[in-house]
């Protein structure tokens, strides 16, 4: 099972003075079970792109295939698609609406026509998946911290049992602790369930640590696509379009240029520390 885009283009306000080409012939395939990051500066097209994945926006031209079927064909079941491809918008906590946490997470399954017992079962499973404490299930969602609200909102999507989870800037507005907790939980969720996770972010540091594949959007086009290590090798090209690679990328490239025998492909502080430690250890062994 996969999501496949074939030459997807999208134009806002076509034929008017406000015409804007938000997506330009974007082609890519996301296999089932992959953890993908989509990154780009404001206006790059990344948010427009993900809203095509569950049919919230319809491409001006091109095809979008989910599980081999073109979602733009007449009679395609869009309702089913939107339950299988769950989209969590920026600041999803603004959509919380029920009197307590458990009721809020039950909202999606209820709209799928499930019984009260089934709704509650799936809601509890979803809250457990995002690491939300059971003692708060009957608390008003509006009394929670920002990070807790974000978890509840994500659980509300998971309760509908999607096969694909799309997260648009899931850490926006959170402090560093809340940001790390959410991303750690998303990574754990991916490892536990094997579901496809698509993470949209503007932070290279975030995506470098968590995703296995990185897609860079620029001016409505797919600019780069590969592993984080492959993408960050193009750090000068990223700089040219207003994006910065993780700080460790610059440090490791500087060390390599100065003659240190280290890999410049480290994408996290931990990887860089290991690389430097191994280099120093080898040098010490040679000197002794």
Placement of each model-derived feature along the sequence:
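Helix-to-loop junction immediately C-terminal to a conserved catalytic motif
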Residues: 54
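ABC ATPase NBD Q-loop/coupling interface
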Residues: 63-80
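Conserved ABC ATPase "signature" region
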Residues: 118-135
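Conserved ABC ATPase signature
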Residues: 140-144, 148
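Conserved catalytic motifs of ABC-family nucleotide-binding domains
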Residues: 161
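Catalytic Walker B motif of ABC-type/P-loop ATPase nucleotide-binding domains
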Residues: 165-168
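Conserved ABC ATPase "signature" C-loop
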Residues: 219-220
């Amino acid at each position: 099972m996969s999501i496949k885009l074939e030459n997807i283009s999208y134009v806002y306000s076509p034929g008017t003075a406000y015409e804007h080409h938000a997506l330009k012939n974007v082609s890519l395939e996301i296999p089932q079970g992959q953890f993908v990051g989509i990154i780009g500066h404001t206006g790059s097209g990344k948010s427009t792109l993900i809203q095509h994945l569950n049919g919230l926006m319809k491409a001006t031209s091109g095809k979008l295939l989910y599980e081999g079927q073109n979602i733009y064909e007449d009679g395609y079941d869009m309702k089913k698609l939107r339950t299988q491809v769950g989209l969590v918008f920026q600041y999803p906590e603004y959509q919380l609406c029920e009197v307590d946490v458990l009721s809020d997470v039950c909202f999606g399954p209820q709209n799928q026509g499930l019984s009260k017992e089934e709704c509650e079962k799936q809601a509890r499973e979803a809250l457990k998946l995002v690491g939300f404490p059971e003692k708060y299930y009957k608390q008003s969602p509006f009394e929670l911290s920002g990070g807790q609200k974000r978890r509840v909102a994500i659980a509300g999507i998971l309760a509908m049992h999607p096969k694909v989870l799309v997260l648009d800037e899931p850490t926006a507005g959170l402090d560093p602790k809340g940001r790390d907790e959410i991303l750690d939980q998303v990574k754990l969720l991916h490892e536990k369930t094997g579901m496809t996770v698509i993470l949209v972010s503007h932070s290279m540091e975030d995506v470098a640590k968590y995703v296995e594949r990185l897609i860079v959007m620029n001016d409505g086009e797919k600019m780069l696509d590969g592993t984080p290590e492959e993408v960050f090798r193009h750090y000068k090209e990223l700089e040219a379009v207003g994006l910065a690679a993780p700080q460790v990328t610059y440090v490791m490239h500087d060390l390599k240029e100065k003659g240190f025998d280290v890999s410049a492909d480290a994408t996290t502080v931990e990887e860089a520390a290991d690389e430097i430690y191994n280099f120093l250890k080898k040098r010490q062994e040679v000197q002794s």
